[in-house]
Each structure stands twice: as C-alpha cells, then as structure tokens.
C-alpha cells in the first residue's frame, strides 16, 4: 500500500485475515493502554503545534501524530508496574460495547486506578509522526 508520500507500507491479506485467539496477556495489555488513553489524548491536545520529535515534520494531519512513551517505554512501565503491584492482576476483562475495546472490569477498578497513577507519575511522552513511530524500535 502507498500513502500520499509514496511510502510503501507492507500489507499482507493472509496475515490480516487470520484470527488469532487473544491471550490474557493481550487483553491485559489492551486494557492497560485503554486505561491511560484519556491522558495521552490530553497530552496531545495540550501540545499546540504538533512537531515530530524525530524528523521534525510539522505538516502532517492531526491524526498522523502519535503520542509515544520514551525513557521509559510503555513496555518497561507496564512490566515494572506488574512486578510492583500488590493487587491481584486481572485474568478476565470486559468489552466496551460501543467502541469494541478490551477494558478492565468494574471489580478491577482499584488495579486500574493504581496503574493509571503509576503510569502518570513515571511516564514521559513525546510526539512522533506516524511513520517515525511505526519505524521506531520498540
């Protein structure tokens, strides 16, 4: 597939159409990302003019700028929190019927809130354009 700047994005129909059963770890990751989504949106909105921290582009569409975790990465934050928490790590998750998202269940509200607090105290964000974010080593 090509985008408007003729950058070729690899695309594989067979891979996309294969249904892979999601694991508990997948659902936990999705729920943790969803729990902090409001904070990432607020960060992006507060930036004013969006400029990619890597390539310095500033003429992309708003939706083509991503909020990226760095130093520490999201993965590092997630893993450290899971090591430190004294709360039971959820093993089952809810589904947001409106947006079709994996979310924490109501009974895991304390775990979710602890995660949000930990994340917000320890995260660093940067703005990257879509292309730089997708090419960035995770």
Show which residues each predicted segment covers.
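Short cysteine-rich clusters marking metal-coordination/redox-active sites
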Residues: 52-56, 129
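A boundary/linker detector
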Residues: 1-49, 57-61
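Helix N-cap and loop-to-helix transition residues
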Residues: 12, 72-73, 129
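Histidine-centered nuclease catalytic patch
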Residues: 58-124
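Short metal-binding segments enriched for Cys and/or His
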Residues: 6, 11-23, 81-104, 135-138
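Cys/His-rich metal-chelating microdomains
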Residues: 58-61, 131-135
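Domain-exit/linker segments immediately C-terminal to small folded modules
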Residues: 111, 124-127, 133-137
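Short metal-coordination and nucleic-acid-contact micro-motifs, chiefly zinc-binding Cys/His arrays
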Residues: 44-51, 121-125
């Amino acid at each position: 597939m090509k985008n408007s700047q003729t950058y070729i994005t690899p695309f594989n129909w067979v891979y996309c159409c294969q249904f892979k059963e999601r694991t508990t770890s997948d659902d936990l990751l999705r729920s943790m990302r969803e729990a902090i989504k409001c904070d990432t949106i607020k960060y992006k909105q507060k930036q004013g003019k969006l400029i990619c921290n890597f390539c310095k582009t500033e003429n992309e569409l708003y939706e083509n700028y991503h909020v990226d975790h760095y130093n520490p990465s999201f993965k590092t934050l997630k893993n450290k929190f899971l090591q430190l928490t004294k709360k039971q790590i959820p093993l089952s998750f809810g589904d947001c019927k409106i947006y079709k998202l994996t979310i924490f269940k109501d009974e895991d509200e304390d775990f979710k809130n602890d995660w949000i607090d930990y994340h917000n105290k320890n995260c660093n964000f940067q703005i990257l354009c879509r292309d730089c974010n997708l090419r960035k080593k995770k």
